[in-house]
Amino acid sequence: MRKKECEVTDTAVLQRILGRATLCRVAMVDGSEPYLVTMNCGWDGEHLLLHGAAQGRKLDILRANPRVCVEIDEDVQLVFGATGEECTANYVSVIGTGTVSFVLDPRTKRRDLNVILHQCHPGVPDEVLPDEALSRVAVLEVQFDHLSCKAKGATPRP
């Protein structure tokens, strides 16, 4: 990280940010072209969990190349100055690189979907999706090999 003064190295802070995130941006490479999507997410303490339709471009790309870069941010605030030169943004962000795996086991898929559900909608009861509905959903686990966190003009929330 270029600006070491912005780096957050406390792994507990990183875990809390991942445990609060409901949306993330997932970047991948389609041949020689970049491709980026916003996805709902959840954190099980080891993997970032993602879900989406069981077919489509992003899944085709990930089957060919499962490497991803993920970005999560929170507390984003634009700061306006008297001139354009004085404008900036304050934020806390997490960037991670890793490898996606497709969750195929129905039990694991249901568990992961409930992790995402509870993270995005706290307090809602577990949902038991029927097999037919489960077949229409892709669940992905991102195993990170690198994570970094940056806080610029903001303090990570407890």
Locations of regions flagged by a protein language model:
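Short Pro/Gly-enriched beta-strand edge/turn motifs at strand-loop
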Residues: 8, 20-25, 122-125
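Short, intrinsically disordered, mixed-charge
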Residues: 19, 61-68, 115-122
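Charged, gly/pro-rich active-site loop segments
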Residues: 2-5, 75-158
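Broad gene-expression machinery/nucleic-acid interaction feature
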Residues: 23, 36-38, 67, 91, ...
